[in-house]
Every structure is written in structure tokens, then in C-alpha cells.
Amino acid sequence: MKKNNSNPLKINEYHTLVNKLFLLIEENIDKNQEKCDIDCELHHNMLIINLNNTNQVIINKQESLKQIWLATKKNGYHFEYINKQWICNRTKKDFWNVLQESCVYQTNKCIQFLKNIY
């Protein structure tokens, strides 16, 4: 049975967008390292953000759905690329807002993520 995938992105566009997103997250983490103990590791299709050596935020590619998923100790989110931004299909929140809220919640520190840090 064929999956119903209404996302019009071509697979190469999807990978380009997610790779850019992962790079931007890494750059943002570098800028926040002075504020709190935060770093990240890239493993295949997964970016793991380590917070205060005790918590993690995990972001991974869901290629077959052309989505990115974000998992925290509090919740899980599925994002689709809509109108040039990643939007949660449940909460309708922008990816960057959810990422920032999740990191602040897990560290109790003011962490700022910017879509464009240049």
C-alpha cells in the first residue's frame, strides 16, 4: 500500500533543508555554550543536544514522511516544512520556538536560538 505523503518537497530538497537546519542548530549551540552546559553530537540522521550533562533534546530526520521530529523529556513534536519554516503538525508552533522552550525548560537557563545568527 502506498503511503499518502502530501508534502510536496522533493527528497533532495528535504535533505538540503534539514542539513541546513542541523548546521544552524550547531552554530546556535556554540553561541550559547557560555550561558550553560550545552553541546551537540550528530549521529547519522539524528542530532543530540546534551544539556547540563543530564538532559537531552533529540532531533531526527523522518525521511519517508519528509518531517523532522524533536523529542524531549516532556514531549515529542513532528514538524513539516510549510511556507519556508518547520511547523509542528500538532501545536502549529515554529520549530525554533519549540526548541528554545524545550531547552529552557530542561536547563532553567535563558537560551536563545536564532533562525539566522549572522
Curated annotation (Swiss-Prot):
Record GO terms (molecular function): ferric iron binding; ferrous iron binding
One annotated Gene Ontology cellular component of this protein: cytosol
SMART domains: Frataxin_Cyay
Keywords of this entry: Iron, Metal-binding
Keyword Metal-binding: yes
Listed InterPro entries: CyaY (IPR047584), Frataxin/CyaY (IPR002908), Frataxin/CyaY_sf (IPR036524), Frataxin_CS (IPR020895)
Any Gene Ontology biological process: iron-sulfur cluster assembly
Family assignment from sequence similarity: Belongs to the frataxin family.
Protein's job: Involved in iron-sulfur (Fe-S) cluster assembly. May act as a regulator of Fe-S biogenesis.
UniProt name for this protein: Iron-sulfur cluster assembly protein CyaY
Provenance organism: Buchnera aphidicola subsp. Baizongia pistaciae (strain Bp)
